[in-house]
Amino acid sequence: MHAIPSGVRICLNKIAQNIVPRKHRGKILFHGPVCVLLICAILVCSAAFLYGFRHNCAEKWEKGWRAWEAGDSALALKEWSAGRFFAPFDPGAPRIYYWKIRALENMGRKKEAETAASLMASRFPLDFYTIALAGDGRYPFLSQAAASACRSANYRRRWEKEISAASAKTGVSKNMLMAIVRQESSFNECAVSKSGAVGLMQLMPFTAREAESRIRASGLSLQDPAHNIVLGASHFARLNRKFKGCLPMALAAYNAGGAAVSRWKRGSGGLMEWIENIPYRETRVYVRAVIRNYSIYTATDADRKQEDLSSFPIFPSWGRLSVSAKKSSAEK
């Protein structure tokens, strides 16, 4: 009994008053199986409650998204707004904010869009969707909040020497390589995934062999940091050229494979719509996470001029990454 916190005991007593007969109430509740059953009941009910709210959020999102793609901003806004009560339980709340703002803009409700953008800036300054909206440049206060949050983020940098060398060889920016390594392996050079991807940039052996043949480098372990990073950088540079510098598509290809991304045709919408329509949840999460990482590393780059830090987009022509169209020196 003494091991149970007082707050929990009070809650259990309240529940007991409603579900346990009067003659069985009292301290006996905190001994043996009755206590265990009550705690289990609370946990199960809480999980069901949370699941129900999140399911409602997902349902509202899907209905709103179908309306958005059909060109009906009013219906999309109605569905997304209907789920606002559930936002505290929805890990995708920043996404709802972003698309509600887009819908409000389409409907000419600029003041409401500004209010939503202000809330988004204060609540989710480091989220991918906030950074994406900041990149549009329509809300200076949001851009400033996102830039400030990026500069204040304590994102560690590791393997800088190896990353700089790979960047020089392949033309991929140091900040992009840092962002990918962070997401792929959390800077663990010994990381091996369940699918067999190895090292800092999580290369599959056959992908590594292709990259080795391009840059004429072999014989080293994929867990060698310098070797792994330069191979991964070469692979990413090739994907970036294949998809004509489209950053979200290149990142999606790095995660899911170039063949898969080639099947995901771009419709009439923009890059944000394309990201939302990526069929694989893991790849959607990956693309958003790496772009966020890249934005933060770019904002905190010691080589970046201080006066440029408040400017968004952090990467040129939102969604595009400049990598030399020519083959890198490592591939000649």
Where are these regions (language model features)?
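Hydrophobic membrane-insertion alpha-helices, especially the h-region
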Residues: 35-48
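Catalytic glycan-binding domains that act on GlcNAc-containing polysaccharides
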Residues: 49-63, 67-70, 86-95, 107-332
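Helix-turn-helix repeat elements of alpha-solenoid scaffolds
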Residues: 68-81
